[in-house]
From Swiss-Prot:
Entry keywords, A to Z: ATP-binding, Ligase, Magnesium, Metal-binding, Nucleotide-binding, Purine biosynthesis
Positions contributing to Mg(2+) binding: E271, E283
Name under which the protein is recorded: Formate-dependent phosphoribosylglycinamide formyltransferase
Record text on subunit structure and interactions: Homodimer.
Top-level class of the enzyme under EC nomenclature: ligase
Metabolic or biological pathway: Purine metabolism; IMP biosynthesis via de novo pathway; N(2)-formyl-N(1)-(5-phospho-D-ribosyl)glycinamide from N(1)-(5-phospho-D-ribosyl)glycinamide (formate route): step 1/1
GO cellular component, one term: cytosol
Species, as recorded: Alcanivorax borkumensis (strain ATCC 700651 / DSM 11573 / NCIMB 13689 / SK2)
GO biological process: 'de novo' IMP biosynthetic process
Keyword ATP-binding appears in the UniProt entry: yes
Gene: purT
Matches recorded under InterPro entries: ATP-grasp (IPR011761), ATP-grasp_carboxylate-amine (IPR003135), ATP_grasp_subdomain_1 (IPR013815), PreATP-grasp_dom_sf (IPR016185), PurT (IPR005862), PurT/PurK_preATP-grasp (IPR054350), PurT_C (IPR048740), Rudment_hybrid_motif (IPR011054)
Listed Pfam families: ATP-grasp, PurT_C, RS_preATP-grasp-like
Entry's EC annotation: 6.3.1.21
Length: 397
């Protein structure tokens, strides 16, 4: 049975978030609701989760020595990675010493780069995927493109949110895509994956939760989430995504296989391509997923609430979906350390519409600063409402 201590005492249930962005902030809020003492860690100060957590630390999370130092200082009951760019080798050592890493240190290590998780999915579990090759040199990359053929997609093996990702349509795209991939990786220059283009009808995120049910571990699923990407970065998501019963069942089978292989407790964002009733595995995140922000309005328990319950060993008797819902992101380009947001009154004028501003401390380039959430009678109507809310915003930089 789960026992929660009292914050700011010796018996506090301390949970350390490694990564303190907008997803981490929602997780922190849910954990605090259950009485946890949250420690938010990131590479920069005043990150969104730091603004709500009881404590915060700024470190280079790719530095194993710095990571170990803050863990040994805090001695958390749970270490919860919220991003990929972490010294996962150190997490493996810490777990072996008795610390609990969510869902497991191995899951964090495998999903930190696309090579580990793709090899697990395609080669160990025999899940259907797009054809792929890995390369760590320009010559090897050019050979990989020749073998895969056009069109294809190139991504750094270590990146997220579409950074460094390109679609290649012909020979002229080869060199620019390589250079962009080398600049877009989270851990600097390095290895890339070249993937054959899947001719899919749509793509989904299937949020999959491994949680306690008595003495057993049970797997539960949220309704499928459809989403629209631009340059690998999510722009809109909606739930539920209409799909055939056969495709939904196949999606759940793929999600079950990959999450069982990763193990542990918590929510997983399983990304899948759907073509008719055929399902192709794309990626998995062992944590809440950005497209799952829609669940803040579409479910009685959001993906963040589900994650908090699961990692604390609490029951999840049911996952209730509340009907057609959508999210639309506030993506801004520019430079500023003091943004001002106009249009909130207009954005919230429609019924069943909500907004989350993430409170990010600065912008240098393109950055997601907020999200609009909407419910309606149909998916199209919900998307229109969410997009209308975002269109109301003007951000002064």
């Amino acid at each position: 049975m789960t026992v929660i201590g009292t914050p700011f005492t010796d018996n506090a249930t301390r949970v350390m978030l490694l990564g303190s962005g907008e997803l981490g902030r929602e997780v922190a809020l849910e954990l605090i609701r259950y009485g946890c003492e949250v420690i938010a860690v990131d590479r920069y100060a005043h990150a969104p989760a730091m603004q709500v957590a009881q404590h915060s630390h700024v470190i280079n999370m790719l530095d194993g020595t710095a990571l170990r130092a803050v863990v040994e200082q805090v001695k958390p009951a749970l270490i919860v990675p919220e991003i990929e760019a972490i010294a996962t080798d150190e997490l493996v050592k810490l777990e072996a010493e008795g610390y609990t890493v969510v869902p497991t240190a191995r899951a964090a290590q495998l999903t930190m780069n696309r090579e580990g998780i793709r090899c697990l999915a395609a080669e160990e579990l025999s899940l259907p995927t797009s054809p792929y090759r890995f390369a760590d040199s320009l010559a090897g990359y050019q050979q990989a493109v020749r073998e895969i053929g056009f069109p294809c997609v190139v991504k750094p093996v270590m990146s997220s949110s579409g950074k460094g990702q390109s679609t290649l349509k012909n020979e002229a795209d080869i060199l620019p895509a390589w250079e962009y991939a080398q600049s877009g990786g989270r851990a600097g220059k390095g290895r890339v994956i070249v993937e054959g283009f899947v001719d899919f009808d749509y793509e989904i995120t299937l949020l999959t939760v491994r949680h306690k049910a008595g003495s057993e571990i049970k797997t539960s699923y949220c309704a499928p989430i459809g989403h629209r990407q631009e340059n690998g970065d999510y722009q809109e998501s909606w739930q539920p995504q209409p799909m055939s019963a056969a495709a939904l069942q196949a999606s759940r089978e793929v999600a079950l296989a990959i999450t069982d292989a990763l193990g542990g407790l918590g929510i997983f964002g399983v990304e899948l391509f759907i073509k008719g009733d055929q399902v192709y595995f794309s990626e998995v995140s062992p944590r809440p997923h950005d497209t799952g922000l829609v669940t803040l309005i579409s479910q009685t328990l959001s993906e963040f609430a589900l994650h908090a319950r699961a990692i604390l060993g609490l029951p999840i008797p049911t996952i209730e979906q509340r009907g057609a819902s959508a999210s639309s992101v506030l993506l801004i380009q520019g430079q500023s350390e003091a943004m001002r947001y106009h249009g909130l009154n207009t954005a919230l004028a429609n019924a069943d519409t909500e907004v989350r501003l993430f409170g990010k401390p600065d912008i240098n380039g393109s950055r997601r600063l907020g999200v609009a959430l909407a419910k309606a009678d149909t998916i199209d109507a919900a998307r229109d409402k969410a997009n209308t809310a975002i269109a109301a915003f003007k951000v002064d930089l």
